[in-house]
Amino acid sequence: MKTSINYLPEQKRDDLRRIVECVLEVLPDCEMIILYGSYARNTYVDYDQRIEYGIRTCFMSDYDILVVTNTRFQRYIINHILSKATDNYYKGKNRYASTTVQFIDESIDDLNKAIDKNRYFYTDIKREGIMLYNSGRYKLARRRKLNYREIKELAEEYYNDRFERANDFLRNAMYDKNDERYKICSFHLHQACEN
């Protein structure tokens, strides 16, 4: 995994160092902090504003951060802890003009199981991500070649999860169409296709 963020502008590097500090302040058993997504791939959008169909839109990439801990936390506990880190990061900043931070968290055991099972989201993070902090107490698993049965199980699991969600969005789109709520209908159709 990469470790350098030197290709980023100084302000972005400072932001990422501050994010690491803020996480470590509130989460002492943090094992790794990994930048993934557009900033890790250097495909980020700092700020894009345009007018589409007469509507002004703007877009900024956010910092996607994976926080790895040595224990599995209850969802509400880790969300509360990471929201404190987010609040600390924004102190003294214009929250609406700053690059936003999106945290996800995993225990080291769950992350290594996901990498071992070739779960694409996590293997992409390992391949493209940048290690911002590493306690050195754990190592990330290596991808292994799955046998046919494992590939089939993984594909069925992805399909069942995605297909159910896509059907939920499609159902909502049909209700929206019947109620002549076409904007939200188009959104739900888009979500159905994306899943």
Segments predicted by a language model, with ranges:
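Conserved NTP/Mg2+-binding pocket subregion across the NTase superfamily
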Residues: 2-11, 88-171
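Metal-dependent nucleotidyltransferase catalytic core
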Residues: 2-26, 46, 53-115
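Short gly/ser-rich loop at a beta-strand->alpha-helix junction or flexible surface loop bordering the NTP-binding
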Residues: 31-45, 49-52
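Hydrophobic/aromatic side-chain positions at a characteristic register within alpha-helices
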Residues: 170, 177-178
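Hydrophobic alpha-helical packing segments in soluble, helical-rich domains
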Residues: 185-195
